[in-house]
Amino acid sequence: MTIWLGSQPLVLASQSYARQMLLQNAGIPFEAIPAAIDERGVQQASGLTSPAEIAARLAEEKALAVSQRLPGRLVLGADQTLALGERTFNKPADRAKATAQLRTLSGRRHELHSAIALVRNGKTVFAETSVARMTMRQLTEAEIEAYLNEAGDAATSSVGGYQVEGLGVHLFDGIHGDHFTILGLPLVPLLNYLRQQRLLAF
């Protein structure tokens, strides 16, 4: 028996390993087809400044881009932004930028805004955005250096320079919010919608 009642697998418009694992662990069959969109360009063209709205727009644009190539398929787009006050962060391009981000976040509380959008035939049928609040402990230069040495590529593959599901958890004093939101996919609202659409067995 499979939990999924859809005639075709869900399409995930992302190459995020964390998002893929969340869907896999929830028993949702999917095909990962990353959306090739210019995220910075979309953000600038939108004129949006709210981290939550930026995440929502990018999630929708990713799903729309993939939906155009796959008529009839249900496509899931997702995005996450990190905000420290009015300032938003992108994935650090290299180790030096990861170091700078961690220095800035050290000893302060920031927010992770995670958004999802479900699109079919170019139309958004469901969208959700949620927030988690993360308090990073005061880090010394030696601790930042040691963390980056151990984290390797994980430090430049996630916004903020950390993956909380891995070694990044050592950087925090407090975490407030949904675990799935922190990992970049508000899973419970997604499952609730799929259940309402009779796409899940229970």
Curated annotation (Swiss-Prot):
Quick one: where is this thing mainly located? cytoplasm
A Pfam family matched in the record:
Maf
Q: Which residues form the active site?
A: D79
Q: Name one GO cellular component term.
A: cytoplasm
Give the UniProt subcellular location, in the record's own words. Cytoplasm
Q: Which GO terms describe its biological process?
A: nucleotide metabolic process
Provide this UniProt record's keywords sorted from A to Z: Cytoplasm, Hydrolase, Nucleotide metabolism
**SUPFAM superfamilies (alphabetical):** ITPase-like
Protein EC? 3.6.1.9
The protein's annotated catalytic reaction(s) are:
a ribonucleoside 5'-triphosphate + H2O = a ribonucleoside 5'-phosphate + diphosphate + H(+); a 2'-deoxyribonucleoside 5'-triphosphate + H2O = a 2'-deoxyribonucleoside 5'-phosphate + diphosphate + H(+)
The protein's GO terms of the molecular function aspect are: nucleoside triphosphate diphosphatase activity
InterPro entries, per the entry: ITPase-like_fam, Maf-like
Its needed co-factors are:
a divalent metal cation
* Family per record: Belongs to the Maf family.
Provide the function of this protein.
Nucleoside triphosphate pyrophosphatase. May have a dual role in cell division arrest and in preventing the incorporation of modified nucleotides into cellular nucleic acids.
PANTHER family tied to this protein? BIFUNCTIONAL DTTP/UTP PYROPHOSPHATASE/METHYLTRANSFERASE PROTEIN-RELATED, BIFUNCTIONAL DTTP_UTP PYROPHOSPHATASE_METHYLTRANSFERASE PROTEIN-RELATED
Against NCBIfam families, the record matches this protein to: maf (TIGR00172)
Its protein name is Nucleoside triphosphate pyrophosphatase
Q: Please tell me the species this chain comes from.
A: Rhodopseudomonas palustris (strain BisB18)
